[in-house]
């Protein structure tokens, strides 16, 4: 069979270059030739595909993250590139650090989040341009905008980085009288507070408070910066005092809470002043200074009353009752706890209700008034049942059971002391059935009672029977 000669094929320059680089080619191409061929391809694309520039080709060839870095360098923002590159390196190390701690890392890589890269480019380059001109307030504003953009649980470390940058730049701003410096101190205080370094947080909040003292500066929400400083400082002092109280360092805890109370009064905020008084009163109570605790807690009670703050008033009554009980003044303590129960019931504060009823039950149980104790423990148990909290149900159930047992104890004691067959039969009958004991008038009302009668036994009679003289 006759064969036809092969048809002549014409190839473009681009196709020729591409075919020469196919992996099936056995020809080894030197590096210099590869670079030249790349330049030839770029030139060919630029000449034959109008509207597709060399930069556009690079944009399609490179990742978006690399393109952002290239743009920064091409536009002359070398400091911005250095800062962004360092943040990128740290970002890439986060999954490895999480894996070392056996944590599941869910955050996407930075190259998959173009919006964040755009914000980096926009604000970092603007900040660098302003810094070159000496416009430090504009530098601060751009860096703070980045801190606000990254203020979320995933990127908090990025936010903290820009908080530190803002703090350093704020030291150079003198035209605003120190307002930016005060804001930067506030942000650094928050940074350390969230990390649990309360002493460093207190230092920054103290500087924030000092810079805003006597100033009418306001934040973005219209709140006075001095009030924000007072609130931040009082909160940090309280957290520090909690640690001191855990370590039984009552003197230092009281000392720092007194400072918190003074700052709260300076802020002219009655609610904050009341909170400071409450925690100071608790510190005095923990240290055994009951009279001082009562004085401070009564002030908190007065403030809560003036503010119509039922929750605060209930807390005040609870703490005052504890102080009175520690002094042995149980009657006064009962009065305050009954007020606490009323407030908790009216405001549907179930946990407060359980706590108040349990405290009342304990007091009546110690006094030997078992009917009252059983009544309050039953209220606590019923409230815990409504909440369906297993731990609370178990605890209140035990208290209620003990109070019921104490009620029955007097009836059992009466039957045992009767020392006759009727009393013995009643005891045996109860042991077999564990039901309510039927009252037998033959045994006499003076020394014996059924379980029903014991539940309604006057508290005075119970206390008399329990007294050492009667025993």
UniProtKB/Swiss-Prot annotation:
Instruction: Print the domain comment field.
Output: The TPR repeats are required for axonemal localization and flagellar beating.
What is the documented function of this protein? Answer: Axonemal protein which is implicated in axonemal and/or peri-axonemal structure assembly and regulates flagellum assembly and beating and therefore sperm motility.
Q: Name one GO biological process term.
A: cilium movement
An example GO CC term for this entry is: cytoplasm
Report the record's disulfide bonds: none
Where it sits in the cell: the answer is: Cytoplasm, Cytoskeleton, Flagellum axoneme
- By what name is this protein known? Tetratricopeptide repeat protein 29
What organism is the protein native to? Mus musculus (Mouse)
Placement of TPR repeats on the sequence: 92-131, 136-173, 182-215, 234-267, 274-307, 314-347, 354-387
In what tissue types does this protein appear? Expressed in spermatozoa (at protein level).
TM helices/strands, residue ranges: none
Q: What happens when the gene is disrupted?
A: Knockout mice generated by CRISPR-Cas9-mediated gene editing display minor morphologic and ultrastructural defects of sperm flagella, which result in profound alterations in sperm flagellar velocity and beating frequency that strongly impair fertilization.
Q: Which InterPro entries match?
A: Bac_ResReg_Asp_Phosphatase, TPR-like_helical_dom_sf, TPR_rpt
Top-down, what is the taxonomic lineage of the species of origin?
Eukaryota, Metazoa, Chordata, Craniata, Vertebrata
Keywords attached to this entry:
Cell projection, Cilium, Cytoplasm, Cytoskeleton, Flagellum, Repeat, TPR repeat
Q: What is its main location?
A: cytoplasm
From the UniProt entry, list the residue stretches annotated as the region Disordered: 449-471
């Amino acid at each position: 069979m006759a064969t036809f000669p092969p048809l002549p094929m014409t190839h473009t320059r681009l196709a020729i270059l591409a075919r020469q680089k196919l992996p099936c080619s056995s020809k080894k191409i030197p590096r210099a030739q590869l670079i030249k061929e790349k330049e030839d391809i770029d030139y060919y694309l630029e000449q034959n595909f109008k509207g597709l520039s060399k930069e556009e080709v690079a944009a399609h060839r490179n990742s978006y993250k690399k393109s952002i870095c290239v743009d920064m360098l091409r536009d002359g923002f070398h400091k911005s590139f250095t800062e962004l590159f360092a943040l990128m390196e740290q970002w890439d190390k986060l999954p490895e650090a999480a894996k070392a701690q056996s944590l599941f890392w869910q955050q996407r890589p930075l190259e998959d989040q173009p919006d964040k890269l755009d914000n980096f480019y926009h604000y970092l380059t603007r900040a660098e341009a302003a810094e070159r001109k000496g416009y430090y307030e504009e530098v601060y504003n751009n860096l703070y905008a980045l801190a606000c953009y990254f203020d979320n649980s995933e990127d908090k470390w990025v936010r903290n980085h820009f908080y530190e940058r803002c703090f350093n730049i704020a030291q150079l701003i003198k035209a605003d009288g120190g307002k930016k410096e005060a804001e930067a101190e506030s942000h650094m205080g928050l940074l350390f507070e969230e990390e649990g370094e309360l002493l460093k947080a207190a230092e920054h909040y103290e500087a924030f408070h000092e810079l805003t003292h006597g100033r009418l500066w306001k934040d973005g929400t219209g709140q006075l910066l001095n009030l924000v400083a007072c609130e931040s400082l009082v909160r940090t002092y309280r957290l520090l005092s909690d640690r001191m109280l855990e370590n039984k360092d009552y003197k230092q805890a009281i000392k720092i809470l007194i400072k918190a109370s003074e700052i709260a009064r300076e802020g002219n905020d009655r609610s904050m002043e009341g909170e400071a008084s409450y925690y100071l009163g608790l510190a005095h109570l923990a240290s055994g200074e009951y009279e001082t605790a009562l004085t401070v807690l009564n002030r908190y009670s007065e403030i809560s009353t003036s503010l119509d703050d039922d929750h605060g008033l209930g807390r005040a009554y609870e703490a005052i009752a504890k102080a009175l009980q520690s002094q042995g003044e149980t009657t006064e303590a009962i009065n305050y706890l009954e007020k606490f129960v009323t407030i908790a019931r009216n405001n549907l504060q179930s946990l407060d209700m359980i706590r108040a009823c349990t405290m009342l039950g304990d007091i009546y149980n110690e006094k030997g008034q078992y009917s009252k104790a059983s009544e309050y423990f039953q209220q606590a148990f019923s409230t815990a049942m409504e909440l369906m909290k297993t731990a609370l149900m178990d605890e209140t159930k035990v208290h209620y059971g003990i109070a019921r047992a104490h009620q029955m104890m007097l009836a059992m004691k009466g039957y045992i002391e009767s020392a006759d067959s009727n009393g013995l039969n009643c005891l045996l009958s109860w042991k077999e059935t564990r039901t309510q004991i039927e009252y037998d008038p033959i045994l006499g009302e003076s020394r014996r009672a059924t379980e029903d009668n014991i539940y309604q036994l006057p508290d005075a009679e119970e206390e008399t029977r329990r007294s050492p003289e009667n025993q």
